[in-house]
Each structure stands twice: as C-alpha cells, then as structure tokens.
Design a protein with these regions (language model features):
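N-terminal leader/targeting and assembly helices and adjacent pre-domain segments
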Residues: 1-100, 185-269
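Active-site nucleophile-adjacent alpha helix/oxyanion-hole segment immediately C-terminal to the catalytic cysteine
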Residues: 63, 67-71, 263-372
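Internal glycine-rich, Lys/Arg-flanked active-site/core loops of soluble domains
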Residues: 81, 89-134
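Extracellular structured ligand-interaction cores
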Residues: 109, 135-137, 175-179, 413, ...
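Conserved short secondary-structure elements within globular domains
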Residues: 115-188
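Compact mixed alphabeta submodule
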Residues: 158-221, 445-479, 483
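Papain-like cysteine protease catalytic cores
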Residues: 347, 351-438
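Active-site or metal-binding loop neighborhoods of secreted/extracellular toxin and effector enzymes
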Residues: 397-493
Length: 493
C-alpha cells in the first residue's frame, strides 16, 4: 500500500495541494473505523444507535483526509533537490520514510488506541443521555492504566449531573490514551475539584464525541494547522464519497456503502477512470460486459445443428476461432465486469489468454476477485457444503432450485460458479430483485429478453447443473463485496 501511495505522490499527475492520495486515505480511514468499531463493541450501551455510530465513521473519513493531506504535502516538499530538479524516486522514498514511519506507524498507533477509547466513551455517553431520568449523575472512574498520569487524579470520584458545565471542560478521554472512564449513578453530586489551565484538554481532544460524533476535534493540528488547499481538497473528496453512498441501493448497510465507496476510489485510481452513475441492468447486461464475444453458432430455423430444446443453428460466418475464442472462455471476468458496471464503471472483460490472471481465475479461483467489506477474503457458499448441511448426496434440478432460493434469498447480485453435466463449468450471475424475482443474467453472451436466448433461465441452470461438484463451485453475493485490486488487469476500459 505504502509504495503505491508514494508512487502516486511522486507522479506528475498528482497535485498534493488539491487532491487526497487515495491509497493512504483508504488505509487510514479503515484503521480508524476499525478502532471505532472496537470501541463500540467494548461499550456497555444497550441501544446501538446506528445512525450516530455511522456519523462517527463518516467523520473519521474527514479526520483521515486531513491527516493524509498533511502527510502528502510534507512528503511533496522533499521532491526537488536544491537546484529544483526532481529527485530519483528511490532517493526521495528513502528521505520521506521517516515521515511515513511516524504518520502511519507510531502516531497512527496512538490515534488508533485513542479512537478505541473515545468511541467507547461516545457510545456510553449516548446511553447516559437515554437513562438520565433514572440515573441523572455521572461519576469519574479512576484510570485502569498500570501507570496512570497525575493530571486526572484530582477528578477521580467526582460526581456531577450529566448536563453540568463541568463535563464540557473536563472529561475522561481528553488526554491521548487516557484510560479513565465514566459511570452513571443516582448518588448525590460532589463539589467540583479545583483545576488549573494545565488541566485543559490536549489538542484535538477538546470535544465530547458523544455529542458531536467526532473522535477528534476540529481543533486537531491536522485541521487547525492544515496546509494550503486542505479544506477544499477534503470537502471535494467527502462530496464524492457522499455522492457515491447516496446512489447505492438500500439493500446495503451503511458500513458496506462506505467500504464500497473506498473501493470505488481505489478502482478509479488504478484504472485512471472516473466512475459514472450506476448502470441499469439493461446497460450493464445485453453482452455489454463482453462486447467482443462472437457466437460460433447462430440461431437459424434452417440450420443443421440442433440443441436439446429443438432450437436450430448454423455456423456463424463472422466467427474467427483464433480471434474470438478468448472471449468465449472468459466467464470469470464477465461476471465481475457486470457487477462493476452496475456500480457505474464502464469496464469490459478481457479475453482469457495463457498465463493471464484470468487463466488463473478459471482454474477454480473465480471467487478470489471479491473481498468482504473489512478487506478479508470472501467465502462462497459451496454446493458441497450445502449438500452436507442438508444431508443430500448429490444435486438434482429440484435441489438446485432449492439451493438457489436459499443462498440467493436477499435482494442482490450473486456470482455463480457451476459445473455442467457434460463436464467443464461456468461463472455467471444470478440476481434477486426487489419484487422477489430471481433472474439468470448471462454477462458473457446475451440471454436477455429479445435476444433469442432468453430460454436460458434459472430453470435451465438447474437442469444443466452437474450432480456432483468441486468445492470451488457455489454462490457468493457480490454487490456488497469489494473488488480485489490484485485482479484489476482483467478488465478493459
């Protein structure tokens, strides 16, 4: 990640004053969000208050963007030598490594630990607000640190009403890595301890995250001491992220939407394109994901070839085996191409050629192009594991239909890897729509209504599916997944 980020900053196309480097931003935002979620898990708050927690996660993006803007500009200042010439990349990289080590190493660790604590406290505070009619006061609980600092010791045991001005001036969590906490109580309040200017919150921790949903305040040096252009660059990035989130389907959680927005930024950066508005099924389908595919046989009432359904075909005079075969064996690219087209990326599938990433995917690795929202490898629901759970020995057309309806129950887009009765296999798309319809969408070659091949439907898959399968066969929902950039080269743009 760091090398990619440094290459981006070094690039002549990147403008450190007006842009935010995407690789660093995504990594830091993800780390701070992980810290926040860890803090939420540690909280004893009974009501999850999802809207408030989502607001914290979004505000983490703002903090991360300001942090990256500071870091990238500190690095960019070292790009030129004393004569104004661009330094060789390796020399510059070595010179900026201390900045990187501090910002994404030591200091990010401190920010992570503090974010855990303050997210925990924010969730607790919301709970205190909800129950203040019963437990109107808060007690300052002493630090759990093995070596607690003395600066908060005078406040230990202090009890004040939750709405008391004291809590606006002093709180657990207003020191980096502070391990004091609060508890709600109906015990009587105690006098306010004496304090001095030395007891003021540390920079960046002046706010109450339980009130404004910000783990770090707007007075943090990344913002109060921001480099020129920072606010404009951050606002532009956040507007782009908000736009992408707003256009996503409501069958995704807010966390999934944020993760996909990050993934979209990385895809844009890797492909050097700008994502458009989400495509309709018709725009993404109708062989638009694989436009260079040419059918070897075409429907012809007088044709000499016939399939099991009685349809007649003749050879396509425009078919060139050398040219066209790679686009008939590239289904493992067509399926993700369709999914990314739905997001708004005008990508198409490359042909399957020896030694390519696509050839690797075609050898039982098709699902490796997808990751979970947290970046971990995504796992499909294999046909074999489903058979075992059901106590079945083998698949039948009826069982395939049962399997599809169970694993594709939620509205969404699903990639299917299926083995055929006659051998070989195929990767394709099943899509569950809001009205409950489950549709077989073939992104490699058109099977949409009016194509003449619309008889290739879900029932067709059930009838053609093999009775026994390799473990690589199965189904995975992919519209809520991230695309693995390791395989970005399988697309044309």
């Amino acid at each position: 990640m760091l090398r990619r980020a440094l290459l981006n900053i070094y690039s002549k196309e990147f403008h450190p004053a007006s842009e935010i480097e995407v690789c660093l931003f995504n990594e830091i935002w993800a780390q701070i969000n992980n810290a926040a979620k860890e803090g939420f898990r540690q909280s004893r708050a009974a009501d999850p208050d999802e809207d408030f927690r989502n607001e914290i996660l979004r505000n983490n993006a703002v903090f991360s963007a300001f942090k990256v803007h500071r870091m990238q500009n500190d690095m960019a200042r070292l790009l030129l030598d004393s004569k104004g010439n661009l330094k060789p990349f390796e020399q510059w990289k070595n010179e900026v490594m201390p900045i990187a080590s501090h910002q994404v190493g030591t200091w990010l660790r401190t920010e992570y630990d503090t974010a855990v604590i303050r997210a925990h406290q924010a969730a607790d505070w919301r709970q205190f607000e909800r129950e203040k009619d019963i437990l109107p006061n808060l007690r300052w609980v002493e630090s759990t640190s093995i070596h607690p600092g003395l600066d908060h010791k005078r406040f230990w045991g202090t009890i004040r009403p939750i709405d008391d001005a004291f809590w606006s001036e002093h709180r657990p969590g207003d020191r980096w890595n502070c391990k004091c906490s609060l508890s709600s109580t109906d015990e009587p309040e105690t006098p306010v301890p004496e304090s001095s200017p030395l007891d003021k919150p540390q920079k960046g921790l002046e706010n109450n995250p339980g009130k404004d949903a910000k783990l770090f305040s707007d007075q943090h040096p990344y913002q109060s001491g921001a480099r020129e252009g920072a606010k404009k660059a951050v606002d532009k990035l956040m507007a782009r992220i908000d736009e992408m989130i707003d256009e996503m389907s409501n069958n995704l959680t807010y966390e999934e939407k944020m993760a996909i927005a990050r993934n979209n930024l990385e895809i844009e950066n890797s492909l050097k394109v700008t994502k458009g508005r989400p495509m309709s099924v018709e725009e993404a389908d109708k062989q638009n994901a694989n436009p260079r595919h040419v059918n070897e046989l075409v429907l012809d009432p007088a044709g000499i070839y016939r399939d099991g359904r009685g349809n007649r075909y003749s050879r396509n005079k425009n078919y060139d085996r050398t040219r066209d075969m790679p686009y008939s064996i590239n289904c493992q690219t067509c399926a993700p191409a369709y999914a990314l087209r739905l997001r708004g990326f005008d990508v198409t599938a490359k042909g399957n050629t020896p030694g390519s990433k696509l050839e690797y995917l075609s050898r039982g690795h098709a699902f490796e192009v997808w990751m979970n929202a947290d970046g971990t490898p995504a796992r499909h629901v294999s046909i074999n594991s489903w058979l075992d759970a059901k106590g079945y020995q083998r698949m039948t057309p009826k069982r395939y239909m049962e399997y599809f309806n169970e694993v594709c129950k939620e509205e969404g887009v699903y990639e299917l890897c299926i083995g055929w009765k006659g051998g070989s296999g195929h990767a394709t798309i099943l899509q569950r729509f809001a009205d409950g319809e489950l549709r077989y969408i073939e992104p490699q070659s058109d099977n949409s209504e009016g194509s003449g091949m619309e008889w290739k439907d879900v029932k067709y898959l059930c009838e053609k599916g093999a009775s026994t399968s390799h473990n690589c066969r199965g189904v995975m929902r992919v519209d809520n997944k991230l695309f693995n950039l390791k395989f970005i080269e399988i697309f044309d743009v």
